Amino acid sequence: MASGLTANKKLRHKITAAALLVTLGVVYGDIGTSPLYVMKSIVAGNGGMGHFDTDFLVGSVSLIFWTLLIITTVKYVLIALRADNNGEGGIFALYTLVRQRARWLVLPAMVGGAALLADGMLTPAVTVTTAIEGLKGVHINGNILIDNQQQVIWVTVLIITFLFFIQRFGTDLIGKAFGPIMFVWFTFLGVAGFIALSKDWSMLRALNPYYALHLLVSPDNKMGLFILGSIFLATTGAEALYSDMGHVGRGNIYLSWPYVNICLVLNYFGQAVWLDQNSKVTAFNKITDFNPFFQMLPESIRLGAIILATLAAIIASQALISGSYTLVSEAIKLRFLPRLHIIYPTRLKGQLYIPVVNTILWLACLAIIGYFKTSAEMEGAYGLAITITMLMTTLLLYQYLRSRHAPAVVAIGTLIFFSAIETVFFISSAVKFLHGGYVTAMIAFIILAVMYVWQYGGRIRDDNTYRAEMASLFAYKNQLSELRNDPDYPTYTTNLVYMTQIANDHYIKKEILYSILDKRPKRARVYWFVTVNVTDEPYTAEYTTDTYGTDYMVNVQLYLGFRMEQQVNVFLRQIVNDMMREGELPTQPQKYTTIPDRQVGDWTFVLLHEELSPQTQIKGFQKAIIQARLRLQHIAVSPAQWFGLEYADTIDETVPLVLGKIPITKLNRLTRSQAEAQPEDEDD
């Protein structure tokens, strides 16, 4: 029997004015706040004000323009957005589309995901700090609002702490304001940039890629190739753009990106013109944390611009926080990470909250702010990890194109072209390792190590489960039938449920049958064996059943999308009613009940917990991985919470985890005289 379950199906994202506003608020927060620090980083890297000329500025904005065009527009908007999994995007969604091609593709998926999570920890810190630094030296009624970096740090910490605190309540209410605010922000970027650019239209020659390439070898560029480490900051939000596709739809991104891109480019060009016209003003050399974004604005509107920039930075941070929840949730469903407690604070699709992730992100942000102290120092660490994610995405995109039978020249050309560019960006960003990049590299390594232990440990366990530990349900049909009708044993429950994995339609781990028959015979009317299969599609909600020709044994195969909540208790109640309606199971009328005409009896769920047995035969590295995986289970959410059984009647039983074939040692029986003839131990 196959059927569908009630679920939140994927919505068709219509292209409307409201949807476009939502897109601005959800998708572009990261890339939209880049003008706050990109030109600042480029100028500081070359020695600051007075250490560059017009050609340097033209080459810099030319590099920014072509980076946005090649990486963001061509790779992500035109190519990657077409590689969607039922409308969902991101590196894990892309992996699910190609994982059948080769087993090793799990590695680039985990590396890319770990790097993306690590870099996301830095984004809230750098964007909010940069915005608040704009308040330094600003006068209100003759008083300086903020006059030192210590005050910047405290204000930043308060804002970020508040942002993480409100996550548990859901952000749908304030989220409705994100779109309009970001529309105002991008419009402000474009208008401010256009006004500055109008003072010197010759800056438009930067659209010629010659100036970009020339700057890389120009003596005016003191950073050489490493200037690309700062240029790359302009496109770090491209990966988030792809990951957030499922929230807004491809069409809304297609239509909104040109406007966003134009506003960004205008602002970068405007900053370049202002820098060119003010490069010789020595007074700017005395400004700590000099930022051309704020300095090019008239004093009269600077405070309003700082407030708007702070709101944009908060929205960008919120997008990264929500994206991290989604990324971790997908990793859990793909068995890359241990099961964690996930809360759905609102009824909105895709809005979730993971307490442990929220706490880790918050503490990481505070540690980063306390360690680096200034946005300039943070920029030195920013962007290194995301280059790795982009390289991994390119590799998976190549596999996707091959799986869709794209011409070999197109697939290979895409791989070579983008890999070459992103490798150059990676090399240029590698210098950041010594200037703080080691922080994100270390975080990414820790996340990757956890992913590797969990995923590879699970594979070792599955590959080494000895066949003798599996048993056919057919072989025990008669015993289960006799037990359910045996009056010598009290009824344990009406419906007894085991969460398991059934192989070849009828093989289950023998420990389950041992739990039913040997440990303490559990008499029930129906024995349920439930398997949850996570599908490559995000919102699948289907099931199949097999009763093996009985009315007391049911094999349930649940097929749930990798973004679906596993509410097994709720789903089983629908399934049993479906089966009773079809005549596959008899009704279970209850004599004592508060529910009139109740036809379904009580349920008990038995959850088995594994502990590594001393008899396990695997050795060395594999045994260490298994032991590490079992330790990770202590931080994981309980199976009852994971399967949606918090309020159900559950029984926990511990079983030994035996991997590999156990050698059988045969004892020789001695007669009494032979035993007495044995030499005695001198120590006794």
Swiss-Prot record:
Q: Where are the transmembrane segments?
A: 19-39, 61-81, 104-124, 151-171, 177-197, 223-243, 255-275, 303-323, 352-372, 381-401, 407-427, 433-453
One MF annotation (Gene Ontology) recorded for this entry = symporter activity
Cellular component terms (Gene Ontology): plasma membrane
Q: Indicate whether Chaperone appears among the record's keywords.
A: no
Catalysed conversion reaction? K(+)(in) + H(+)(in) = K(+)(out) + H(+)(out)
Topology in the lipid bilayer: Multi-pass membrane protein
Coiled-coil ranges per the record?
Answer: none
List localization entries: Cell membrane
Q: What InterPro entries has UniProt attached to this entry?
A: K+_transporter (IPR003855), K_trans_C (IPR053952), K_trans_N (IPR053951), Kup (IPR023051)
Keyword hit for tRNA processing: no
Keyword terms: Cell membrane, Ion transport, Membrane, Potassium, Potassium transport, Symport, Transmembrane, Transmembrane helix, Transport
Similarity comment: Belongs to the HAK/KUP transporter (TC 2.A.72) family.
Summarizing the function annotation, the protein's role is:
Transport of potassium into the cell. Likely operates as a K(+):H(+) symporter.
Protein name, as recorded: Probable potassium transport system protein Kup
* Source organism of this protein record: Lacticaseibacillus paracasei (strain ATCC 334 / BCRC 17002 / CCUG 31169 / CIP 107868 / KCTC 3260 / NRRL B-441)
